[in-house]
Amino acid sequence: MTNMSCAYELIKSLPAKLEQLAQETQATIQTLMIADPNVNKDLRAFCEFLTVQHQRAYRATNSLLIKPRVAAALRGEELDLGEADVAARVRQLKQQLAELEMEIKPGHQQVAQVSGRRKAAAAAPVAQLGRVGVVNE
């Protein structure tokens, strides 16, 4: 195996290795019997951090290796540019679009809920005001 193909394999294996390390660390933390709730909270936060880092490593590695030129360069191969670049870019854009949609949906739902609450809240005080400025005779 050449240095170039070693680099490709090393980068490709990073998410799996990171996942394994994260799982082992999380399993070890879960076996600890710690009475302090603040320490347990910090350890849970650390476990969540490990999960997020694994997900980021997976996405970053996938985004890197999906590019034909990068993958070919890491393997030490030559690549005919053209259709492969276009196809890879389309796949990358689809992936980014899917990720953005997943991020936008919860925010869109929250905006709709807040908007509905504001309309209801605005209607109630106006109805309660009655006639302002009229002196009872």
Curated annotation (Swiss-Prot):
Keywords: Host mitochondrion, Host-virus interaction, Inhibition of host innate immune response by virus, RNA-binding, Suppressor of RNA silencing, Viral immunoevasion. The keyword RNA-binding applies. GO terms for biological process: symbiont-mediated suppression of host innate immune response. It is found in: Host mitochondrion. Signal peptide: none annotated. GO terms for cellular component: host cell mitochondrion. The keyword RNA-binding applies. Homodimer. Interacts with RNA-directed RNA polymerase. The dsRNA-binding region is required for suppression of RNA silencing. The N-terminus is involved in homodimerization. The alpha2 helices of the dimer bind parallel to the stem of the dsRNA helix. Belongs to the nodaviridae B2 protein family. Encoded on a subgenomic RNA (RNA3) synthesized during replication and which is co-terminal with RNA1. Binds double-strand RNA (dsRNA) with high affinity. Suppresses the host RNA silencing-based antiviral response. This is Protein B2. It comes from Nodamura virus (strain Mag115) (NoV).
